[in-house]
Amino acid sequence: MTAAAEIEDLSFAHPGASLPALERVSLAIAPGESVALLGASGAGKTTLLALLDGRLRGWRGHVAVLGTPLDPDQPPPRARRADTGFVFQEFALVERATVLRNVLNGRLGRMSAVRAVLGSPSPRDLDVAGAALTDCGIADLGERRVDSLSGGQRQRVAIARCLAQEPRLILADEPVSNLDPARAAEILTLLTDAAKARGATVLFSSHQPELARRFACRIVGMRAGRIVFDLPTPELDDDAMADLYRENGPLPGVRLKAVT
């Protein structure tokens, strides 16, 4: 079975940085998994997600997404980009546009070039966007402007836009970091349930262990650009968590559980 994402010996440094953001990272994610990247700020989680989304250049190693190897010097093909959806921490919505228009933006990679340029969605585009709005519980907000919404509503719009893209792999960067615990649980339930219903794989980042344990079948701990552990959620113990959030001292040996 082709992995949703496959990474081997990946290293990357941001231009001008004195230390690498990612160092010798290896990771495989099976189709249909819900996997959490767990770690403190600066661990490398956002960088890894951006790289899998095809937005970074100049890395070393092997990276394949949905069976297609990525080129460290070129953006991925348009068709492959359409298969990978991204939920941004800060939403990345068009504030003065309506909710429906923002969700339809998720269809741009599926539209013909002419429709994309003209902003003219097809009946299918409208149907898919409508289904995403319904699944995210915001069907009644379609004509509202985004700048009139609450933070929780905006995150639902961002997820609906991602779902409208019909991705096979969903990458979510700290999708609930700005929400209170109850809202955070609602949003992650929505995201993981919608992905499961569509047969999509989810890789999300978090710095909150309790959310990672609840919504991921597998947790990958990251610190200082390296993987500290990669374990099924039931096997993650308190010692591994303590090692992950220890600020000083050497990195512990990587604990791995093979993906089958």
Regions found by a protein language model. Give the residues of each.
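Conserved ABC ATPase signature
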Residues: 145-149, 153
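Conserved catalytic motifs of ABC-family nucleotide-binding domains
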Residues: 166
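Catalytic Walker B motif of ABC-type/P-loop ATPase nucleotide-binding domains
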Residues: 170-173
